[in-house]
């Protein structure tokens, strides 16, 4: 039993609330336990210089944490005059993960800018950002299609991410900050709805780990991603059916009609997984 009462294979409660920001083309508040991230998607009718004239779009991301998202205040990076290495690493991860499931040619010469702002951190901020940003992105692209600017939703698959680790000698899913700080092995998995790997970030924090441990951790992480993808699909409702690959595995998620301001939640251990 973990400190918060979960079993090793259980996730924290997850809640996704769409249309959280009234101004953005797509927006989500994602809550994973006590971690909360606001994800917004903004469309611009231009592309970076290296893409001009190629007829393709681009997706980029920015990531940041509010000063009191953490236990002690962290100075704003703008006040320090530069971004930290961790911030740059995470926002590049978010951008390339989202690009992996989009038909950029079908987007046309447009840029989708994703902003992920952590308002409260308790572990898993980068994975929560990817999972929430995906939903915000789909909503923004659906608006583009509704305006007649593209003829179809250029989304090839679902996308979600979660963390796993070895804590106290036990493989566990969806680490809190406290668990992450004690983990002997720490791994993040970004995966599509059809089960293809987009990115694996794994580190032996205190010791090397075996291939068998790696395979066990990946299987555990995949089970978490599948639950998150099922939650995304439920939240997107009819729009989710249009995504290229549809996850058919039962999610065990209590149904709530998606819509403006509606949130859908995933309880820990939902669906008996």
From Swiss-Prot:
This enzyme catalyses:
tRNA(n+1) + phosphate = tRNA(n) + a ribonucleoside 5'-diphosphate
Give the InterPro entries listed for this entry.
Answer: ExoRNase_PH_dom1 (IPR001247), ExoRNase_PH_dom2 (IPR015847), ExoRNase_PH_dom2_sf (IPR036345), PNPase/RNase_PH_dom_sf (IPR027408), Ribosomal_Su5_D2-typ_SF (IPR020568), RNase_PH (IPR050080), RNase_PH_bac-type (IPR002381), RNase_PH_CS (IPR018336)
PROSITE patterns, per database record: RIBONUCLEASE_PH (PS01277)
Where is the region Disordered?
Answer: 254-273
The UniProt keyword set, sorted, is:
Nucleotidyltransferase, RNA-binding, rRNA processing, Transferase, tRNA processing, tRNA-binding
What the record says about family reads: Belongs to the RNase PH family.
Which PANTHER family does this one have? EXOSOME COMPLEX COMPONENT, EXOSOME COMPLEX COMPONENT RRP41
What does the UniProt function comment say about this protein? Answer: Phosphorolytic 3'-5' exoribonuclease that plays an important role in tRNA 3'-end maturation. Removes nucleotide residues following the 3'-CCA terminus of tRNAs; can also add nucleotides to the ends of RNA molecules by using nucleoside diphosphates as substrates, but this may not be physiologically important. Probably plays a role in initiation of 16S rRNA degradation (leading to ribosome degradation) during starvation.
Q: Spell out the protein name for this chain.
A: Ribonuclease PH
Which organism is this protein's natural source? Symbiobacterium thermophilum (strain DSM 24528 / JCM 14929 / IAM 14863 / T)
Per the UniProt record, the lineage of the source organism begins with: Bacteria, Bacillati, Bacillota, Clostridia, Eubacteriales
């Amino acid at each position: 039993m973990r400190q918060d009462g979960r079993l090793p294979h259980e996730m924290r409660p997850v809640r996704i609330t769409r249309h959280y920001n009234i101004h953005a083309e797509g927006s989500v508040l994602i809550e994973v336990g006590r971690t909360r991230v606001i994800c917004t998607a903004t469309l611009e009718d231009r592309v970076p210089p290296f893409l001009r004239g190629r007829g393709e779009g681009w997706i980029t991301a920015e990531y940041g944490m509010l000063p009191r998202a953490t236990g002690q205040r962290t100075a704003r990076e703008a006040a320090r005059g530069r971004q930290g290495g961790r911030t740059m690493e995470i926002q590049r991860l978010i951008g390339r993960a989202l690009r992996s499931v989009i038909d950029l040619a079908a987007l046309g010469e447009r840029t989708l800018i994703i902003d992920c702002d952590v308002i409260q951190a308790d572990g898993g901020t980068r994975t929560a950002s990817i999972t929430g940003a995906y939903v915000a992105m789909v909503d923004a692209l659906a608006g583009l299609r509704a305006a007649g600017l593209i003829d179809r939703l250029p989304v090839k698959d679902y996308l979600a991410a979660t963390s796993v680790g070895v804590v106290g000698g036990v493989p566990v899913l969806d680490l809190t900050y406290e668990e992450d700080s004690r983990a002997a092995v720490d791994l993040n998995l970004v995966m599509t709805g059809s089960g293809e790997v987009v990115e694996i970030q794994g580190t032996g924090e205190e010791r090397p780990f075996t291939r068998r441990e790696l395979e066990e951790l990946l299987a555990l992480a995949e089970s978490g991603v599948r639950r998150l993808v099922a939650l995304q699909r439920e939240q997107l409702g009819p729009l989710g059916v249009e995504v290229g690959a549809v996850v058919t595995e039962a999610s065990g998620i209590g149904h709530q009609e998606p819509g403006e301001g509606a949130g859908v939640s995933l309880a820990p251990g939902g669906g008996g997984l």
